[in-house]
Amino acid sequence: FSFAPPKRGDYTVVAVSPEVKAEGESLPLRDVTKVVLHVQTQNGWDRRAVTSKASAVELSPLTRPYGLVGGMAFHVEADEPAEGDRKALAGIVIEAERYNATPPKELPPDEHVTRTARSSRSGAAVVTLTEPGWWGVTAVRERDKVQHRCTLWAFVDKQSTDK
C-alpha cells in the first residue's frame, strides 16, 4: 500500500475486510478499519468516510483524532452507512483498547483493559484515552447473520514536560 497526499489536510484511510469465519465464533466477521492521516493542516478530520453499504456500522470522530494527550475525552459518532443523511445508531456498544505491541506478563482485569460506553440516541459516545500510544475505538453490530465491526484508530501523544 502506498499513498502520496496530493495536498495538505487530513485524509481518512479505510480498509474493509471480506467476511471471515473465526474459530469458536458463531457468526462470520467483517472488519472496517479507519485512521486519519494528518498532513500539516487541520482540514477534513471530521469528514464522514462512508465505507460501504455492505457494512452495518460506521464510526466517525467528533474529537480531532490526533494531537491528543493522555486523559482526554474522545468523542465518536456511530451510524448506519448511507449516502446523504446519516442514520444514528443508538445504544451501540463502543469499546476502546490501547494497542500493546508486547502484552504485559500479567493482564489486568478486562474492565481495566477495555473501556466501554453506549452510544446516545444521537449515536454519540465518549471514551477516555488514558495513556500514550495507539487506541482502537470499536463499534460492533450484527446484521444479516454477520458481525460488523468498525474500528477508528487514534494516537495519544506523550505529554510534553517542556515549558
Which residue stretches match the model-derived regions?
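Residue-level recognition of well-ordered beta-strand positions that form the cores
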Residues: 16, 77-79, 95, 140
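Beta-strand-rich domain onsets/edges
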Residues: 26-91, 98, 145-162
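Copper-binding active sites and cupredoxin-like electron-transfer domains
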Residues: 89-92, 119-121, 134-137
